[in-house]
């Protein structure tokens, strides 16, 4: 797709952004058709990076090392024209290191959004007519494990349920381990929660998982 973009318009600026750029930086550097390489946690700086490129026209790679601690990259949503459902990302990264998965290397370690930051975004969207909120993350079950205190995903959901204008709350993919009796009981007390789960089941084969 990157090569096709350059072929269709030789003067276009081609930027590889996200997971591929994060894990394949050295390979992309060898490709003369790629002008910019922008990894995860630098997406919010896309416009300044492009402006810098247009000033000097130098090929560049903006890729942070996510193998150690780094801050959550906030990409806030202010308005959703003619939509009443919003996807709210509350967490990034994963510490699981499953044998078949590249996510911890591409997305880095677990980084959770501050709870008040999440609630502030939801309040703003609710004021603008959003009524349904889908809570997502790369490994959303781990929300809060890297923050000070003992607040986790269920605590966040309970607080979202208190926000005026929120009619429905849904969850993105979960790992089965989080579905405990206490977790389900507390969910039952959140009237807006839609009573179904999407569980991530990669494989039932021990040999594959090893």
What residue ranges belong to the model's regions?
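Proteins enriched for Cys/Gly/acidic motifs involved in redox and nucleic-acid/cofactor modification
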Residues: 1-143, 187, 193, 197
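Conserved SAM/AdoMet-binding glycine-rich loop
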Residues: 14-15, 23-24, 127-210
């Amino acid at each position: 797709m990157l090569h096709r973009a350059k072929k269709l318009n030789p003067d276009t600026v081609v930027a590889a952004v996200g997971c591929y750029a994060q894990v394949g930086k050295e390979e992309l550097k060898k490709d003369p058709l790629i002008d910019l390489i922008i990894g995860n946690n630098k997406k919010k700086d896309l416009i300044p990076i492009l402006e810098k490129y247009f000033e000097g026209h130098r090929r560049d790679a903006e890729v942070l090392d996510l193998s150690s601690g780094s801050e959550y990259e906030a990409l806030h949503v202010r308005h959703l024209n003619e939509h009443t459902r919003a996807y709210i990302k509350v967490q990034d990264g994963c510490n699981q290191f499953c044998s078949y998965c590249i996510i911890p290397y591409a997305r880095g370690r677990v980084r959770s959004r501050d709870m008040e930051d999440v609630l502030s975004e939801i309040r703003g969207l609710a004021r603008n007519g959003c009524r349904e909120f889908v809570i997502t993350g790369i490994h959303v079950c781990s929300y809060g494990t890297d923050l000070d205190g003992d607040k986790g995903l269920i605590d966040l959901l309970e607080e979202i349920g208190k926000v005026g204008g929120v009619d429905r709350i849904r969850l993105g993919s979960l790992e089965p381990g989080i579905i405990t009796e206490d977790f389900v009981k507390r969910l039952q007390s959140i009237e807006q929660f839609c009573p179904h789960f999407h569980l991530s089941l990669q494989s039932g084969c021990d040999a594959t998982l090893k």
